């Protein structure tokens, strides 16, 4: 199989909008191994995955953005800030339900990382693909089990894929991971 095709597949698998599905299932069932945990996971998936996907689809459908990957950094600000709004709504739903701290913490980290990423994107194209994996892994390491440190290895093939597809420079890849790890750690601690 051609290397670019493999890189494209990896970029799709590690799409930042898909990662929260696994994150919310793992964390929710860890903190509430019951039907309640399932409901927390479902709420997280709705506000952190599905609603942002619908928003980006609508923006692409009405030509407000050139592609759903938000490849052009100049088009990222409005979608990212709008997505932050969806995350904030999700956070308040969790807060009203008195969700456990880890659920609130991962939701808050999504708010902070995406908000900062939106402003960075006004000036520079940071890799939000890398941020979308590095932050959730950091949350799993500190909120669930340190064994999840092994999941940082996923950043290697993803970084290679983003570089191979010429979506980012090496520095953009490193900074996308680094800022997400740092901000997530600060928020959850």
Set out the residue ranges of the language-model regions.
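Short, hydrophobic transmembrane alpha-helix segments
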Residues: 27-39
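Transmembrane alpha-helical segments of multi-pass membrane transport proteins and ion-pumping complexes
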Residues: 16-21, 48-57, 87-91, 114-118, ...
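Core segments of transmembrane alpha-helices
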Residues: 19-23, 81-92, 112, 131-134, ...
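Short, Lys/Arg-rich, polar N-terminal cytosolic tail immediately upstream
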Residues: 1-8
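The first (N-terminal) embedded transmembrane alpha-helix
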Residues: 10-30
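Juxtamembrane helix-capping/reentrant segments at transmembrane boundaries
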Residues: 66-83
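Membrane-embedded catalytic cores of phosphoryl/pyrophosphoryl-handling enzymes
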Residues: 100-189
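Alpha-helical transmembrane segments
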Residues: 36-51, 109
């Amino acid at each position: 199989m051609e290397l670019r095709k493999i890189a494209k597949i990896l970029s799709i698998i590690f799409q930042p909008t898909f990662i929260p599905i696994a994150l919310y299932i793992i964390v929710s069932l860890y903190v509430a191994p019951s039907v309640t945990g399932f409901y927390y996971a479902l709420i997280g998936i709705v506000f952190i995955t599905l609603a942002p996907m619908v928003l980006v689809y609508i923006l692409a459908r009405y030509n407000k953005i050139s592609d759903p990957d938000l490849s052009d950094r100049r088009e990222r600000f409005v979608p990212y800030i709008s997505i932050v709004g969806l995350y904030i709504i999700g956070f308040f739903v969790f807060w009203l339900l008195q969700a456990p701290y880890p659920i609130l913490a991962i939701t808050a980290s999504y708010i902070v990382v995406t908000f900062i990423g939106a402003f960075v994107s006004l000036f520079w194209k940071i890799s939000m693909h890398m941020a979308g994996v590095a932050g959730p892994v950091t949350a799993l390491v500190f909120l669930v089990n340190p064994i999840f440190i092994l999941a940082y290895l996923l950043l290697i093939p993803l970084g290679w894929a983003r570089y191979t597809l010429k979506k980012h420079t090496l520095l953009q890849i490193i900074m996308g991971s680094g800022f997400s790890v740092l901000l997530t750690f600060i928020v959850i601690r």
